[in-house]
């Protein structure tokens, strides 16, 4: 009780001294005149060439002209953007996400049930409350279109909302997954996955979605142990037939060779995952090619589960910057849940190997599909445990690179192929006259370096000009959470990133402990190197304005756990001062 009283006293003692003022302006500009980007290098995904010294004219939300600068005259009243030395590419598409999932530890209770720690209802509320943040992160990563391949009926309301939201990608969605299996513990009022028991129920679930105008239909083709895939094939066929009869493409979750082959033979248009149990043979590849099947490999999603369940992470600076810090933080919670968790993550390391055999199979199958001329589309399955919204897309592209795809092939998979795969190529996916103006102005050539987010100078979404550096302005609490995540990952560079160069650390009596970021680096680098199992848990947090007070509890193998209170003060978007209380 005394500790909480100390926190309460500190909380209010710091408020008058450090009030936060919002001085930020709008991160976007809605032009009232044409926009003309001149002398720019256009990444042409149709010819697979970079066209030098081009001019692109935008009026309202559409591209009205593209061509050599010497041949295109800017409209008299145009807003001119000098693209000299810059590269213009189409906005990217993550073709496999889920709005109803947060990416955190508690978002799939059918896979990991931890309701006694953090309820599924709380996770679902968090997703709804933080939708704007997640969507801004997609834009910041250069993703101007997202495709939700299955969720509750509320997906349709989200699509409508995002359609009128400036700082958000365009969304294409469907409703509940038509499933051969009912996973436990998910929302029963507006279920994201619905088991159908016969052909008529499958048709009825397709029909139920029709008034909402789904962009496609999704089937979850799951075969349980001891069950034959043919047993539920009539259900799959019925759903496909009903969808096609209503002019809708069908996406199918079928990760096994047998279910994938049966689904394709039944008329499936899009496989939303890799086949991971068997190498694709020539018969299968020819079947996929002849049926014009779209292949979305989702290479990183199972790795996210494996790394979370074993607590073996490989976070990058990109992950720390572009992931929502609170959801990224939750996936390290297994290190302090102890007996509340259904398993010991240390023992899980004997079960889950990183990389897994399935990972190797998926990489091989992606390369085979690409070589066979099958339309490959980039997608992450973002929202699943350990697969963070927005940030995971770059990791997916790098995994595709690891599979042996060229940068051009990957860029196509993230742009024009996605548009073609979902029947949107007349409006999206390339920089051509008449198409929607979803564009990325880059400082460097993406054909040479796929790290697109780090290179973005300007985002144009439906003709609106957006400044990426203003999309992710972390709150004081988010900054503190970012450094906590990096502390637990023992990543010194990411840990120091939220701190100001002149940061000062004090004890409770005001004695200066550390001054400046470089001194912090020396102090904490050694600490991280000597503490492989370091983990800090937040027992209580209070936030007001730019002051954050954490009650912390830290564990290190071989040492007695220790606790304390840290008071963080944020100024000009950085942590400037920290007071420690042992």
List each language-model region with its residue ranges.
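Metal-associated gating/positioning segment near the N- to mid-region
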Residues: 87-162, 258, 262-266
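A beta-strand edge to alpha-helix "cap/lid" segment located at domain peripheries
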Residues: 506, 511-512, 518-582
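Active-site neighborhoods of metal-dependent hydrolases
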Residues: 204-227, 275-403
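Divalent metal-dependent hydrolysis catalytic cores, especially in the metallo-beta-lactamase
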Residues: 128-157, 168-176, 214-224, 249, ...
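Acidic, glycine-enriched loop/beta-strand segments at the rims
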Residues: 24-27, 42-55, 68-71, 388, ...
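Histidine-rich, glycine-flanked metal-binding segment
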Residues: 21-22, 27-29, 33-34, 42, ...
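Short, well-ordered alpha-helical segments enriched in acidic and aromatic residues
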Residues: 489-506
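Bacterial Sec-dependent N-terminal signal peptides
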Residues: 1-23
